[in-house]
């Protein structure tokens, strides 16, 4: 049996097969979980050696973090001195917004294009849009800030009061928690958005107080974020059943999202986001890279879209499971891959909109009272979408899909979709959807154990909670259709599965959520 070994040293890790054949290289991103996953997939025993144990140690010993602090000098030649929010611009003639940033003199321009956008004639709505665009500029900056992790953040002419500073500090710290964990960084003493209470007039000449005193008179219809998976389709159908006028919208060019919306017999607004090419060059040159809270960025984009197109409600399909932390790092700090899908972010973002943009446009997740399995149960009955949807994230990348089919059949998202759907479908029906029986494949057992929190880290993916994964597996253990499948038989031996709770199939509308009263009234009447 071959061995996998790794040599770690400051700045770079190099994996070698049999100590002579290079498999891949990582720039400050190689961690023990990565190695464990690689070894598991390739059925290899794991042996790790360290050239400099003071830089990196395996989990369970002592995990040193590279501490970045705003009061310290730049470290390692990779850290920037200043990250600036240089400005933003919108051209009503083309529907193109430009967001400009500066990293130590390096200019980065991001472009957002809103198709066939009518420019609002109402001055208050124009002002609200520019406030929303300013918020988008601040939120989207996280994609560029992470590359240099600058000691100083210069917000330029942006309006930063204490509530906005608190929102941004939490978003950048929590939204980059996974990025920091993977790169072994401590950002707690680094990120600091300073208060700037100067209420600079926006382009209409109105102050913030003037803006908030004028109602926008937006129609009570919903702009619904679409992701191509089951959650957004359930959300869309619930609103339609409740008699709410809906408009599906997505960010990016995914063909699959277009197909799911077409199946719903609705038009799709497709907003394009073009990242700065300079960021790619920086990443190629060894800049820090990793996960960013994309849902936060898309939320800000759709807020702008709601004001341009005239929608009172900006609706996402984030469920209660997104509140669960993925893991705790070596310092006991929670790391949530889904932070920007969590209730905490939803509440913070809604409060910022009300205070800094307008109380007349409302942002919320319709599915917050639902567990993942409760959503899946509803979707299992929406058979018309079974042949067109996909939950596999390899379909949805900034640079396009990375698979030819709808399902890669070997990732946490594919596995969780199988686990969540199986209690409500026959093996043949699930095979028809995914093109494989993942629950009957020996090489999938380790991945399903991770979903259930059985001796493995929960994956850094948008999957259900450990409790509901265990409850779903327990359901399969007791189901004659599924109990003889290989993975089900293996996991049935674990006491955690035997002791799991029941599937939570009903929404809990008594729990905290942000669904507006007017929408709740329609839902209750449907």
Feature annotation, model-predicted:
Residues 143-155, 306-314, 421-432, 478-483:
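Short helix-capping/linker segments at secondary-structure and domain boundaries
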Residues 231:
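Hydrophobic/small residue at the entry helix of a nucleotide-binding pocket
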Residues 249-387, 391, 403:
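ATP-dependent adenylate-handling ligase core
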Residues 44-101, 106, 355, 359, ...:
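ATP/NTP-dependent adenylation/nucleotidyl-transfer catalytic domains that generate, transfer
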Residues 30-222, 238-278, 288, 310:
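RNA-binding accessory domains that recognize and position tRNA/RNA substrates
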Residues 226:
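Class I SAM-dependent methyltransferase "Motif I" SAM/SAH-binding loop
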